């Protein structure tokens, strides 16, 4: 079982509440295999991996928001292409 102290992660994010939200979002991505882990998995659960990534400064709110915006833009582009093909 991995032991993770959250103090370093809290310092990276700002407060415990935002840390929980960011770690939960990242853990969900890892659990659903939407994104690959940025640190070695070492047989850890997604929540532990997410906390380790935050602690190392690899993930934060800005990075998560940018990823989601990029995915939304790509999805919108695909949908617009599909609509244009249907209207032809």
From Swiss-Prot:
Coiled coil: none
GO BP, sorted A to Z: DNA-templated transcription
Keywords of this entry: DNA-directed RNA polymerase, Nucleotidyltransferase, Transcription, Transferase
Record EC number: 2.7.7.6
GO annotation, cellular component aspect: DNA-directed RNA polymerase complex
Matches recorded under Gene3D superfamilies: 3.90.940.10
Role: Promotes RNA polymerase assembly. Latches the N- and C-terminal regions of the beta' subunit thereby facilitating its interaction with the beta and alpha subunits.
Assembly notes: The RNAP catalytic core consists of 2 alpha, 1 beta, 1 beta' and 1 omega subunit. When a sigma factor is associated with the core the holoenzyme is formed, which can initiate transcription.
NCBIfam families attached to this UniProt entry: rpoZ (TIGR00690)
Protein name stated in the entry: DNA-directed RNA polymerase subunit omega
Source organism per UniProt: Mannheimia succiniciproducens (strain KCTC 0769BP / MBEL55E)
């Amino acid at each position: 079982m991995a032991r993770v102290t959250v103090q370093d992660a809290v310092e990276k994010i700002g407060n415990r509440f935002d840390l929980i939200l960011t770690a939960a979002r990242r853990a969900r991505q890892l659990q659903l295999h939407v994104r690959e882990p940025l640190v070695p998995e070492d047989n850890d659960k997604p929540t532990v991996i997410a906390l380790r990534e935050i602690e190392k400064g690899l993930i934060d709110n800005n990075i998560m928001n940018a990823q989601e915006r990029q995915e939304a833009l790509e999805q919108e582009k695909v949908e617009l292409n599909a609509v244009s093909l249907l209207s032809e």
